[in-house]
């Protein structure tokens, strides 16, 4: 299988042209733009196609992925995988922990229990500076990393013959 690399680690491309759904949270618009830029660039570089759905915040991302899976079961678009993009920056309340933990848990549950290929690009940071370091394509490129992770999971699912 052809590989793509980032930071010296191989990413595997799916055999067939993959079609993904990017679900992006717009709570921090500028950071969302940077994450989306990285994700779409990585998918285009890999020859994948994608749709984008925007949600208010990261906590809504898992629900939209579930809506898409339910829609596919009813004859709607069948996505090979998903890219979750958002930024959660710690504030003065417990809300950060709830959003970070619950969005991550829900994505992991779908991935493990339902064999859903998800690249998790939801940043959880202490401040804006950390978020920008991770979001910018010229630095951390976590949007691109999440897209390549989703593609790798699609390829591994194909390779291992996992259920759809």
UniProtKB/Swiss-Prot annotation:
GO biological process, one term: riboflavin biosynthetic process
Record keywords, A-Z: Riboflavin biosynthesis, Transferase
Annotated residues for binding of 5-amino-6-(D-ribitylamino)uracil: 27, 58-60, 87-89, 120
Ligand binding ((2S)-2-hydroxy-3-oxobutyl phosphate): 92-93, 134
InterPro entries according to UniProt: LS, LS/RS, LS/RS_sf
GO cellular component term, pick one: cytosol
Residue positions of the active site: 95
An example molecular function term from Gene Ontology annotations: 6,7-dimethyl-8-ribityllumazine synthase activity
Pathway connected to this protein: Cofactor biosynthesis; riboflavin biosynthesis; riboflavin from 2-hydroxy-3-oxobutyl phosphate and 5-amino-6-(D-ribitylamino)uracil: step 1/2
Quaternary structure and interacting proteins, as annotated: Homopentamer.
Function statement: Catalyzes the formation of 6,7-dimethyl-8-ribityllumazine by condensation of 5-amino-6-(D-ribitylamino)uracil with 3,4-dihydroxy-2-butanone 4-phosphate. This is the penultimate step in the biosynthesis of riboflavin.
Name this polypeptide is given: 6,7-dimethyl-8-ribityllumazine synthase 1
């Amino acid at each position: 299988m052809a590989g793509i690399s980032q930071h010296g680690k191989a990413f595997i491309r799916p055999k067939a042209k993959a079609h993904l759904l990017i679900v992006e949270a717009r709570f921090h618009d500028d950071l969302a733009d940077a994450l989306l830029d990285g994700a779409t660039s990585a998918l285009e570089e890999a020859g994948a196609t994608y749709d984008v759905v925007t949600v208010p915040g990261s906590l809504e991302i898992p629900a939209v992925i579930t809506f898409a899976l339910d829609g596919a079961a009813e004859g709607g678009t069948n996505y090979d995988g998903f890219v979750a993009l958002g930024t959660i920056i710690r504030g003065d309340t417990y809300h950060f922990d709830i959003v970070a933990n619950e969005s991550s848990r829900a994505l992991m549950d779908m991935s493990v229990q339902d064999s859903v290929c998800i690249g998790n690009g939801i940043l959880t940071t202490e401040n804006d500076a950390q978020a920008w370091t991770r979001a910018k394509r010229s630095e951390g490129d976590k949007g691109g990393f999440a897209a390549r992770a989703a593609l790798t999971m699609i390829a591994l699912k194909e390779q291992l013959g996992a259920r759809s």
